[in-house]
Amino acid sequence: MRTRLLLFSCLVAIANPLMAGNPARARRPRLELRATPRMAFSPVLVFMTAELRGGEDSEEFYCPALVWDWDDGGRSVQEADCPPFASGNTVDRRFTAEHAYRAAGVYNVKVTLKRVHRSVAAATTTVYVRSVLGDPGESE
């Protein structure tokens, strides 16, 4: 009976990542999103860069689709160009997109990485667009 209890305890410790210090969480890549420019006058073409960095490559982050929510009613989907998968490599991937803003506003742009219809990472940044000085449509 003692042997069974000891074996059960060992299996629980291995199967539960919280008890094992959760090393998988420490190796999880992070997604960063940048806009260039972040502040501009309308109309403006904004270039976005999403970088997936750090952690070890895994099937979860291999060949994601990107969903861009431009916060102006527009949305676009981009399929990733996939390098050959090799387990244990460090993740360092860069994705780019561009979007034109024609109206003044504060836009919270969000990119979501999806794999097999499941979100695996997301990041948000803010873009500030002002009307041209002296534009009758600009309110003070």
Predicted features along the sequence, with ranges:
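Extracellular/lumenal mature domains of secreted and surface-exposed proteins
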Residues: 16-140
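Sec-dependent N-terminal signal peptides
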Residues: 5-12
